[in-house]
Amino acid sequence: MLSLSHYLILGAVLFAISVVGIFLNRKNLIVLLMAIELMLLAVNLNFIAFSHYLGDIAGQVFVFFILTVAAAESAIGLAILVVMFRNLRTIHVDDLDSLKG
């Protein structure tokens, strides 16, 4: 049987992979969005693990709110990506300053 520490270690590894993904690739907007989503999923895994092992449902409810915010963040990020690619024909993060109104 898996204990709480196994889930927390898995969550920490996923979080570390996402942080490394953010620091190693600061140019591509798609990779940055995927790394941020992986970071949020690692946090959700920790919430679910704590909620299960403590017998409290509040952590599981909080995960639904995080998933809702993550979906909105992904939609806004992809909308910015589409506008950026349509106007500039590139998805490099360095070119985001040219989207000023």
UniProtKB/Swiss-Prot annotation:
The chain crosses the membrane at residues 4-24, 30-50, 61-81. GO terms for biological process: ATP synthesis coupled electron transport. GO terms for molecular function: NADH:ubiquinone reductase (non-electrogenic) activity; quinone binding. InterPro entries: NADH_UbQ_OxRdtase_chain4L/K, NUOK/Mnh_C1-like. It is found in: Cell inner membrane. GO terms for cellular component: NADH dehydrogenase complex; plasma membrane. Its EC number is 7.1.1.-. It is a multi-pass membrane protein. Its main location: membrane. It holds the Pfam family Oxidored_q2. The keyword Plastid does not apply. Keywords: Cell inner membrane, Cell membrane, Membrane, NAD, Quinone, Translocase, Transmembrane, Transmembrane helix, Transport, Ubiquinone. It catalyses: a quinone + NADH + 5 H(+)(in) = a quinol + NAD(+) + 4 H(+)(out). The keyword Transmembrane applies. NDH-1 is composed of 14 different subunits. Subunits NuoA, H, J, K, L, M, N constitute the membrane sector of the complex. NDH-1 shuttles electrons from NADH, via FMN and iron-sulfur (Fe-S) centers, to quinones in the respiratory chain. The immediate electron acceptor for the enzyme in this species is believed to be ubiquinone. Couples the redox reaction to proton translocation (for every two electrons transferred, four hydrogen ions are translocated across the cytoplasmic membrane), and thus conserves the redox energy in a proton gradient. Belongs to the complex I subunit 4L family. This is NADH-quinone oxidoreductase subunit K.
